Amino acid sequence: MEYKHRLSELDTYLFAKGTHYEIYEKMGAHLAEENGEKGTYFAVWAPNARSVGVVGDFNEWNAEANKMQPVQQSGIWDLFIPGVKKGDLYKFAVETSQGYTVLKADPYGNASQLRPDNASVVTDISHFVWEDDEWRAAHQEKQINVPMAIYEVHPGSWKKDPDMPGEFYNFRRLAVELAEYVLDMGYTHVELMPIMEHPYDPSWGYQVT
């Protein structure tokens, strides 16, 4: 099936320079429409791969079913697959330069299965609306020459939910108790250790999904 690359020459140029600050809008998995058909557009950077395919429930995890196409000489591979919808599981089947195939979760994925499973999940984040204009405006007025005392904290291990043994606090509850604690202790700022989804809890988030 014919499709067109969604990454322009400017996209690949800025990506190679490391200065494409909206590349997440193109990479990963995005619900899309091609020639009147709804589906999902996939893009991943695998510069040393011989070939890359998309596998998932939709093709019975067959690495040969949906082969991606290289985008110019950028090292990026992409593909539009009709019928792939929100909630579908997927991974990238990467044929290495040595000739063997490995399955990889999406480094730009917006959702993932809960451990110990680790497939990426097609999702839609277009409905999310940032509501931090007031905070950003106030932030611009803050003085930058006043003393700072930063409290570094790992959200997953700072406190556990006493009402649900073994479970983490959600961020809404954590925000209230953590803010009260740091103010009481005299801190002015909080630095959160990695908060991206990660498959191994003891890693503290440094091994991201």
Q: Could you say what each language-model-derived stretch is?
A:
Residues 45-52:
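Short proline/glycine-enriched turn/loop motifs at strand-loop junctions of beta-rich domains
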Residues 1-37, 41, 71-152, 157-166, ...:
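The feature marks proteins involved in alpha-glucan
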Residues 63-72:
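Solvent-exposed serine/threonine-rich low-complexity stretches and specific carbohydrate-binding patches
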Residues 137-140, 175-186:
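Short amphipathic alpha-helices and their capping/turn segments at secondary-structure boundaries
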Residues 44, 92, 153, 182, ...:
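Conserved, mostly hydrophobic/aromatic
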Residues 166-169, 181-209:
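Aromatic-lined carbohydrate-binding/catalytic grooves of carbohydrate-active enzymes
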Residues 52-54, 90:
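Short beta-strand elements bearing conserved aromatic residues within extracellular beta-rich modules
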